[in-house]
């Protein structure tokens, strides 16, 4: 798989919102028990249990989103880590889950894609429309995943659904763009954006039946499609509308 490194077409202005989203995701990760940086959570099994409770508290549990009711923790979690000591409004987790990551590698993988495609989409949409679109893509991805697996009590976390939406929008808003990508083991090549992101989308689709994976491929697909649809509508709005948006951003 080709890993995108940077957009060969530089942005026309500083992508402050993309930088802000990257910074927020990094800071949130460092302050959660999933990060070794947050030493105040303890070590070993204590940290693992706090990370588990934290994930269930702020992650998006499909059954909670579809029913509107907080669900009890799984029996094995209660056995190993004790009962939940929190109450939550399930709908809020559709937002909070977008900023949680299970590991530094999970975080890095998401932010690489956001860095590459986010700047271009922000450049074309304007800062506020881009920020609102990012959050909307994330919501579509989270709720799409929940509707597809309404009985699941496994929390969904990660920014990948929202970032997938940005990727879908990028393909439409910059169809002739090229992305400098790393093809393992040593090849660095400039590829058309539709090749890199189209290949990524096909991989997500083909991986839907992988029951052993803990990757939310369905959320990725919902987010990507939401980004494509949004960008098509934005493009149809006309050049004047887009220029006005750019001047406001």
Give each language-model segment a name:
Residues 1-249:
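A detector for small-residue-rich transmembrane helices and their helix-helix packing motifs
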